[in-house]
């Protein structure tokens, strides 16, 4: 995995700005995200939750506020430091663990729920990651992954066409980038496998081949007219949820 250390270094530089975005989301978008997670949460009871690629701990703090036991897991030490800070400000406690999402340091069947947001596109071995996540999930537990086709434009004409739309944004909000140059991660993304495939179709096919008995996907589409006057529809972001076989 030639790129993993370069990926870690980049996200360490992003930790401060990404933490500001997490604090903003916890203040302004908590209800939206709770509504998206609620179908996978019990009405009562405490779950053992693993937040993979937790970053500054958005999902970790959100779910800990509900009383669940959360392990915040990330490869980047700067992100874990911010996750602990954000948890303290939210008045909750987290367990943090540093490691590779493609090779988890947990025993089989350790968690009731696994959540992840904006991680899998970064991975060099995403199929291995999904297998690992299901390994540490308990039978009947849910894996819920939010991600997007962030670098699909490198290999797909419709996604490249979207970049020419007058209202296009690349997601790098200057208020949260704090002057960090995204060029390193842009270059890395060109060599990552998920930049080359259509998602969540790839994710569904991969998870169906593993220990799952139920898969659900929700997509956020972008519609526009390209420079040739043709109507185009692309999937920008998505949620995919899988239940491990009981």
Give the residues covered by each predicted segment.
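Core SAM-dependent methyltransferase catalytic element
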Residues: 210, 227-246
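Short alpha-helix
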Residues: 194-211
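Conserved class I S-adenosyl-L-methionine
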Residues: 1-45, 58-62, 142-179, 221
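A short SAM/SAH-binding and catalytic strip from SAM-dependent methyltransferases
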Residues: 113-126
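Class I SAM-dependent methyltransferase SAM/SAH-binding core
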Residues: 50-52, 56-103
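A short glycine-rich, Lys/Arg-flanked "PGG" loop and its adjoining helix->strand segment in the class I
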Residues: 127-139
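A short acidic, Gly/Pro-enriched loop at the edge of an enzyme's catalytic core
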Residues: 102-113
């Amino acid at each position: 995995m030639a790129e993993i250390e370069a990926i870690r270094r980049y996200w360490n530089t992003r930790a401060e700005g990404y933490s500001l975005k997490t604090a903003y989301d916890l203040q302004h978008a908590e209800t939206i995200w709770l509504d998206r997670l609620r179908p996978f949460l019990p009405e009562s009871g405490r779950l053992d939750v693993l937040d993979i690629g937790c970053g500054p701990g958005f999902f970790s703090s959100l779910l800990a506020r509900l009383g669940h036991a959360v392990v915040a897991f990330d490869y980047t030490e700067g992100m874990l430091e911010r996750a602990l800070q954000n948890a303290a400000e939210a008045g909750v406690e987290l367990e943090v663990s540093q490691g590779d999402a493609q090779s988890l340091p947990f025993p089989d069947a350790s968690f009731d729920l696994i959540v992840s947001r904006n991680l899998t596109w970064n991975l060099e071995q995403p199929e291995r990651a999904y297998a690992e996540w299901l390994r540490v999930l308990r039978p009947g537990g849910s894996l819920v992954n939010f991600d997007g086709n962030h670098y699909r434009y490198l290999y797909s004409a419709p996604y490249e066409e979207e970049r020419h739309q007058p209202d296009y944004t690349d997601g790098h909000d200057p208020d949260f980038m704090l002057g960090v140059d995204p060029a390193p991660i842009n270059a890395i993304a060109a060599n990552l496998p998920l930049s080359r495939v259509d998602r969540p179709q790839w994710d569904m096919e991969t998870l169906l081949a593993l220990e799952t008995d139920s898969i659900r996907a929700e997509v956020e589409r972008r519609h526009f007219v390209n420079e040739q006057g043709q109507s185009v529809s692309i999937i920008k972001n998505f949620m995919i949820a899988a239940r491990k076989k009981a």
